[in-house]
A protein has these predicted regions:
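Catalytic core of non-heme Fe(II) oxygenases with the double-stranded beta-helix
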Residues: 141-177
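Glycine-rich loops and low-complexity Gly/Arg-rich segments
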Residues: 56-60, 104-106, 115-116, 175-176
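N-terminal auxiliary "cap/dimerization" subdomain that precedes the catalytic jelly-roll/cupin core
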Residues: 1-99
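N-terminal start-of-chain detector that recognizes signal peptides
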Residues: 2-6, 50-52, 120-126, 150-157
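A short linear-motif detector with a strong N-terminal bias
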Residues: 9-12, 58-59, 127-132, 157-163
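Conserved aromatic-histidine-acidic binding/catalytic patches
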Residues: 40, 44, 118-121, 168-172
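Signature of the catalytic double-stranded beta-helix
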Residues: 80-148
Length: 177
């Protein structure tokens, strides 16, 4: 496992946003915040946002599309997140698997993706995001927990005669409540 030092980052999710989102999740079961509001909730500068977004250029073609599509690009990684300790640990790299019940198109298949880029994982926004969400979930559950985050950023490319399908398997579900 690879422990990530998160103490050097000054980026943090605004505690008021964490609390208000946690309350909304407890009440409604979900929350939606527009991208601009997320950016402001982290005091994220435009330069930090742009530098993080550039990692989507380095995603690799998803070769596991049952529909033979060549429009989805991704990488994969999993982490243990301990918000109360401010600690994130990268777990050993392995395949991404979803059941057929959750993903009828690509389920029950071990899908191997390239790992997340080291600089993506080391970006201050990345750790601030995982720790902030972990704290939000702790508030929802009312306990300091350790969370397992399975993360697969992806990018859909559409071209003039080749449509991109954001979720060709149907409405997004990850099998986690």
């Amino acid at each position: 496992m690879n422990y990530m030092d998160t103490k050097t980052s000054f980026l943090r999710l605004d505690p008021n946003v964490v609390s208000s989102c946690a309350e909304a999740i407890k009440k409604e079961g979900w929350i939606f915040l527009p991208g601009k509001q997320w950016q402001e909730s982290f005091s994220l500068t435009n330069e930090e946002r742009i530098s993080f977004s550039l990692y989507w250029e380095g995603l690799e073609l998803d070769l596991h599309m049952v529909d033979n599509g060549s429009y989805r690009y991704r990488r994969y990684g999993s982490f243990e997140v301990e918000p109360a300790q401010g600690r994130i640990t990268m777990l050993p790299h392995g395949p991404y698997v979803q059941s057929k019940a959750v993903n009828p198109l690509n389920g029950d298949v071990e899908r191997h993706f390239s790992p997340l880029e080291n600089n993506f994982v080391a970006h201050p926004f990345f750790s601030a995001l995982l720790l902030g969400l972990g704290e939000m979930y702790n508030q929802v559950c009312g306990t300091a927990a350790t969370w397992i985050a399975r993360l697969h950023p992806y990018r859909i490319k559409a071209e003039l005669h080749v449509p991109g399908k954001p979720t060709p398997e149907g409405r997004h579900r990850d099998g986690v409540d």
